[in-house]
Amino acid sequence: MIEETQTPSPPAPAPAPAEYPIDLLTVESLDIEAQGIAHRADGKVVFIEGALPFEQVTANVYRKKSSFEKATLTAIYRESSQRVTPACPHFGMHTGACGGCKMQHLHIGAQVAVKQRVLEDNLRFIGKVKADNLLRPIEGPAWHYRYRARLSVRYVRKKGTALVGFHERKSAYVADMTECHVVPQHVSDMLVPLRGLISSMDARETIPQIELACGDDLTAMVLRHMEPLSVADLARLRAFAAANAGLQWWVQSGGLDTVKLLDAQVAELSYGLPEFGITMPFKPTDFTQVNPHINQVLVSRALRLLGVQPTERVIDWFCGLGNFTLPLATRAREVLGIEGSEVLVARSRENYERNKASSHVRPALEATKFVARNLFEMTPAMLVKDGAAEKWLVDPPREGAFELFKSLAALHQQVVTGVPCDDGIHQQSLALGGWTPPSRIVYVSCNPATLARDAGVLVEGGGYRCTAAGVVNMFPHTAHVESMAVFERL
């Protein structure tokens, strides 16, 4: 999502923290931030940036707390078999290194194993849940997968040039990048020309960011500018687009409501879900998955795990643009998509109408509806009002779906124990009518901690068991953990 931001001037460099060396340590594991975890002889934990499991290393401590220390790697005396040479010259643990990736020095298979362990640990320690089965990890291309990104921009007067890219590690400064191995190759090839473009503009000192959004055939770049663009600057943007086929410039002078195409065009951003005959138009301000290759597999697996039958009604909670809703509609009798944003609901309805017009999917999409509702203020009464559905697909933001599952658990307790539900105002026994809880829930998560918390609600008090869980490597080389879990009603 594009936000209204103004990049501040980088702060004055802080005094270098006092460092002191520590003796040889054996790294035991990695934390979620890809820091090696070791223990001193007295049991104190040391987090070591750049170190990998089973390596013997020395390090310099730069932060000392009563229960742990943080350190930077200085030497490796026994190297891990999983250590690899980073593909990108801008990756590293040194000052000035790009902070966009954290794990390029670790083999991709080992990265996935780390994320799987993070998911299992979160389920065990936060949710007190153990999945009956582990799903095979969903994996895709390791490089040039990132179709959405926010590129920071800063013009450096002393150097007479603009920097365009991600921030440096643990810094507000923009990394001095000339290439990037996670964005599409054609975008990486544009980084140096983009630096030249920004440097040539009259507004070069008041452009804080460029938002990148790639579709299957087009690339959109949203230029955030803090002062009006001159006629000459507009001409420079148009010339740059003309020299880079498939590039659309969008401009943003203020909040989200100011984002607009520089020049009206017939072509629009879209991505496809070919297995379901679905094409999803979107705007650069819409939320879409960063990795389109993984998204196709994710949607396919979610529907397969849900096991939707032609006679069933399905609810897609946090439906967004309809990424899951429209494919579900090709399998189910009826689908209800629910989203908290009126804007996204309007966009999902547009996508529904566009795809309904396609003859090969039209019959299955006739019974699809979308509604807007604040899903972070759900109550049992609201849940009953939405009607019964045999299956649920839940794909929340990082905050998770706690209120939704708390309401579901409250209804379960009313049925099982007769304890009245809290409808958000007072306790009352709700008239359930024909309402019944879903027999199966597939939960897609971008935050393993909130997934684990919500899983605990379902398993402890909602009448479900977790039959399967696994990771989705949506963001290779980063510490981000995407995952999914399946819940069956007991």
Swiss-Prot record:
**EC number from the UniProt entry:** 2.1.1.190
Q: Does the keyword Chloroplast apply?
A: no
> PROSITE patterns this protein is in?
SAM_MT_RNA_M5U, TRMA_2
Gene3D superfamilies for the chain: 2.40.50.1070, Nucleic acid-binding proteins, Vaccinia Virus protein VP39
Q: What protein does this entry describe?
A: 23S rRNA (uracil(1939)-C(5))-methyltransferase RlmD
NCBIfam families to which the protein is assigned, alphabetical: PRK13168.1, rumA
Question: Can you tell me which residues form the catalytic site?
Answer: 446 (nucleophile)
Q: Which InterPro entries is this protein grouped with?
A: 23S_rRNA_MeTrfase_RlmD, MeTrfase_TrmA_CS, NA-bd_OB-fold, SAM-dependent_MTases_sf, U5_MeTrfase_fam
Function recorded in the entry: Catalyzes the formation of 5-methyl-uridine at position 1939 (m5U1939) in 23S rRNA.
Q: Which UniProt keywords apply?
A: 4Fe-4S, Iron, Iron-sulfur, Metal-binding, Methyltransferase, rRNA processing, S-adenosyl-L-methionine, Transferase
One biological process GO term for this chain? rRNA base methylation
Outline the extent of the TRAM domain: 14-75
Which positions bind [4Fe-4S] cluster? 88, 98, 101, 180
What is catalysed by this protein? uridine(1939) in 23S rRNA + S-adenosyl-L-methionine = 5-methyluridine(1939) in 23S rRNA + S-adenosyl-L-homocysteine + H(+)
Where on this chain does S-adenosyl-L-methionine bind?
289, 318, 323, 339, 374, 395
